[in-house]
Amino acid sequence: HESKFQENLLDLVKSADIETIWIGNNSSCKHVCDRVKTIDYVDKDSKDYIGYGVLDEVVIEGLKKVLNKKKSNKTLIVLHTMGSHGPAYFNRYPDEFEKFKPSCKSNEPQSCSLDELNNSFDNTIVYTDYIISKAIDVLKKEKESQNFLIYASDHGESLGENGVYLHAAPMRIAPKEQIHVPML
């Protein structure tokens, strides 16, 4: 991966004397976070390891922990969540967030109806909205510093449009569903 050998945004922020921390609940950071402080719940070699498939609420606890121990009011904290990653959308949210039914309960999205698949994906969005609101609540309690939150996904997701599922198609042929990434 090029990120192992090239500076990235986290390196630049850190070089500006801004405390930089990566809190991960997704697969590896692919070397993007190698040179900053990291709390990684899914890396088996990490002292913070919990296990793969843990719900994203764990990053909120990590955020609280970091805010309690931060050394500077100038801090960048990245929350790397599982979010809406497929194929097991139904594993990305607790049962109480299953608002759209029927939902797909399979690791093989093409085995479900498009309605079931879309419902499962939409349930991940409901849970992600909850996680974002919890992060905002935590930041609002920080009275001694000004805070803001930016949310962006790392990619979009194909949900059966034209028979295409998931993500990671090469850019030159990727459908718009995979490359259109909203930001809040």
What function would you assign to each model-found segment?
Residues H1-L184:
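Catalytic domains that recognize anionic headgroups
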